[in-house]
Amino acid sequence: MTIKIIEGDFKSATGKYALLVSRWNSFVVEHLKEGALDTLRRHGVSDDDIEIVYAPGAFEFPLAAQKLAASGDYDAIVALGAVIRGGTPHFDYVAGECTKGLAQVSLATGIPVAFGVLTVDSIEQAIERSGTKAGNKGSEAAETALEMVSLLGKL
């Protein structure tokens, strides 16, 4: 008896991708966007198959992602933002609702929503994760979207 293994790959990147980008903390988020674009392009996705949608902030992502997924125009959505902890509970509310909302959109629609939203304690951590010491989480989210499109095509 042989165990069957099913997994996504990057052999033939196909599909149409929406980058959902937050305007808040744009000094960080623009680097996430550039990382995601670079990754999609390096895997063969044409610029004609990428659309960038700007939303005010991460709290607004679930509704925007729901509309994008419901349109039927996209094979995956890559959410890119940065929620930086401050001195009030605001961070917890925004980060939690964004995370839960995006997961609900993905489950309800069957469209992968890759999570490239930084939830960090400081501006320094955000900068590290947007292209310096800790890599580029926008690039990683784009890779996740590519792999999920491939995987779902095999299931």
Curated annotation (Swiss-Prot):
Its EC number is 2.5.1.78. It is an enzyme of class 2 (transferase). Transmembrane segments: none annotated. Keywords: Riboflavin biosynthesis, Transferase. Pathway: Cofactor biosynthesis; riboflavin biosynthesis; riboflavin from 2-hydroxy-3-oxobutyl phosphate and 5-amino-6-(D-ribitylamino)uracil: step 1/2. It comes from the Bacteria. 5-amino-6-(D-ribitylamino)uracil binds at W24, A58, F59, E60, A82, V83, I84, F115. One of its GO terms (molecular function) is 6,7-dimethyl-8-ribityllumazine synthase activity. Pfam families: DMRL_synthase (PF00885). GO terms for biological process: riboflavin biosynthetic process. GO terms for cellular component: cytosol; riboflavin synthase complex. (2S)-2-hydroxy-3-oxobutyl phosphate binds at G87, T88, R129. It catalyses: (2S)-2-hydroxy-3-oxobutyl phosphate + 5-amino-6-(D-ribitylamino)uracil = 6,7-dimethyl-8-(1-D-ribityl)lumazine + phosphate + 2 H2O + H(+). The active site is at H90. Forms an icosahedral capsid composed of 60 subunits, arranged as a dodecamer of pentamers. Catalyzes the formation of 6,7-dimethyl-8-ribityllumazine by condensation of 5-amino-6-(D-ribitylamino)uracil with 3,4-dihydroxy-2-butanone 4-phosphate. This is the penultimate step in the biosynthesis of riboflavin. HAMAP family: Lumazine_synth. Belongs to the DMRL synthase family. This is 6,7-dimethyl-8-ribityllumazine synthase. The lineage of its organism: Bacteria, Pseudomonadati, Pseudomonadota, Gammaproteobacteria, Cellvibrionales.
